[in-house]
Swiss-Prot record:
This is RNA pseudouridine synthase 4, mitochondrial. Coiled coil: none annotated. One of its GO terms (biological process) is enzyme-directed rRNA pseudouridine synthesis. Its main location: mitochondrion. Its EC number is 5.4.99.-. It catalyses: a uridine in RNA = a pseudouridine in RNA. It is found in: Mitochondrion. It is an enzyme of class 5 (isomerase). Keywords: Isomerase, Mitochondrion, RNA-binding, Transit peptide. The lineage of its organism: Eukaryota, Viridiplantae, Streptophyta, Embryophyta, Tracheophyta. Residues 1-69 form a transit peptide. InterPro entries: PsdUridine_synth_cat_dom_sf, PsdUridine_synth_RsuA/RluA, RluA_PseudoU_synthase. One of its GO terms (molecular function) is pseudouridine synthase activity. Residues 84-170 form the S4 RNA-binding domain.
Length: 448
């Protein structure tokens, strides 16, 4: 009784002072919001800090339909999804959380949903009061529903990220690759030699290091497409679940529609390649059936061009090409526009033209080692980038040509070419290429 009288007096004093009393539901939610690790307390220890991590409001948008409309240049993306369960929405918004942890959160009643209730005040005015209520894994969500998770999930993920990546030079190097960033996407200039996805023997890759592009965020950017390890160029990452789903669908839509019709789509891929030889026609369309064959070791695979596309394992590859410029020494700059996104498609495109590619380890006769000129201390021997990336410089003609690298913001000066002892034939080629004003338009595209 004494406690109840105290609460009434406190509420009356707050009303006289013009300050609204603290809602009881917030204190109750804080007490129930114990840490998943087993802590007893619910308060975070900082005044005014919410004990809950708020997920984006549930939006029943069909990402595939929206991406289809965007890729075709249309308008609305069609009807949305009929609905989603609470556990499905948590997995979409927090793909980095293990499935076992998500299920544990629902079992321990750590997942809440906002509930709006209407109460009648003393002035008979309608007032909305937001409350948090436990939600089960199979509960259906309505548009606008907001789910809440314990805030310690975000804090623990940020602490783990900071502990894992504490090398400031590596972090600065990665963030220096950033070209564009907004609320939905991040665009980076992937260096050569860095794999996009991890695997056996791969320590650092874009998908592992993606969290370094975010400051104090538990949601790391997600991959939506890939580039080959030896290829440099623009790589797009999604910053949230919705943008990632739509970008995934846009890339899939492009490949599927390229085989169905000749419709011009919003998404366009472009590569710039230095090749040996000159195509017969200045532009055209390449079409070839590609297939994988298993090598004798039983583990490795090789991509080959088949005579026909009747086999089930054969995939058609389509690429448009255009000659930028050629020189009398027999080298040509090419623009390649892949319509399909087949694995290692770009390595076989020059072979279809009867020429030899000057990049890629899969073509040993023209093996190059592209490198950023800004980071080179000398022009011979070997060196290294952060994160274990290597560059190699030799005195041969082909390795000198490897320095023709049009990364954004970085160009070699002619004096550096003279310093490394390039032959006259090489300098003629370089002067012809650098004299072309069209090359400046491709300063954000990389050879290959």
């Amino acid at each position: 009784m004494a406690a109840l009288l105290y609460l009434r007096r406190r509420a009356a004093a707050a009303a006289l002072a013009g300050v609204a009393p603290k809602p009881q539901w917030l204190a109750t939610a804080a007490r129930r919001g114990a840490l998943v690790s087993g802590d007893d307390g619910g308060e975070t220890g900082e005044r005014g800090k919410s004990p809950w991590l708020q997920l984006p409001p549930f939006a029943p948008l069909d990402a595939a339909a929206a991406a289809r409309a965007i890729s075709r240049g249309g308008g609305e993306g069609g009807d949305g999804e009929q609905g989603a369960t609470a556990i499905k929405w948590v997995r979409r918004c927090c793909p980095d959380l293990p499935t076992s942890l998500v299920q544990k959160l629902f079992r321990l009643r750590k997942v809440k949903k906002n509930v709006v209730t209407a109460e009648i005040s003393s002035a008979d005015a309608s007032a909305e009061q937001h409350r948090l209520r436990r939600v089960s894994a199979k509960d259906q969500l309505m548009p606008g529903d907001i789910l809440f998770l314990p805030v310690n999930l975000k804090e623990s993920s940020v602490a783990e990220k900071t502990k894992k990546f504490d090398n400031r030079n590596e972090i600065n190097f990665l963030r220096g690759l950033e070209i564009y960033k907004d609320e939905a996407i991040i665009v980076v200039n992937k260096p050569p030699g860095m794999p996009v996805q991890g695997g056996v023997g791969i320590k650092n890759s874009i998908d592992v290091l993606a969290s370094m592009f975010e400051e104090n965020s538990s949601e790391a950017p997600r991959l939506v497409h890939r580039l080959d390890r030896d290829c440099s160029g623009i790589l797009v990452l999604g910053r949230n679940q919705l943008s990632t789903s739509m970008l995934h669908a846009i890339f899939r839509e492009k490949t599927a529609d390229a085989l169905a019709d000749g419709t011009q789509h919003v998404l366009q891929r472009k590569y710039v390649a230095l090749v040996i030889g000159t195509p017969r026609h200045p532009k055209g369309l390449l079409s070839a059936p590609l297939a994988k064959i298993l090598l004798q070791d039983g583990k490795s695979e090789r991509l080959t061009i088949r005579a026909s596309s009747n086999a089930a394992s054969v995939q058609d590859a389509l690429t448009e090409y255009r000659v930028i410029e050629s020189c009398p020494q027999g080298y040509t700059w090419l623009e390649l526009f892949p319509r399909t996104g087949r694995k290692h498609q770009r390595f076989l495109e020059p072979q279809l033209l009867g020429i030899t590619s000057m990049d890629g380890k899969r073509i040993r006769s023209g093996c190059l080692f592209p490198c950023h000129g800004q980071l080179m201390r000398n022009c011979s021997g070997k060196g290294s980038f952060p994160l274990g990336l290597l560059w190699v410089a030799e005195a041969s003609l082909r390795s000198n040509l490897s320095f023709i690298y049009t990364a954004s913001k970085w160009f070699f000066l002619m004096s550096q070419w003279l310093f490394i002892g390039c032959s006259l034939q090489t300098l003629i080629l370089i002067s012809q290429i650098l004299r072309s004003s069209t090359l400046l338009l491709h300063c954000r595209c990389i050879c290959g």
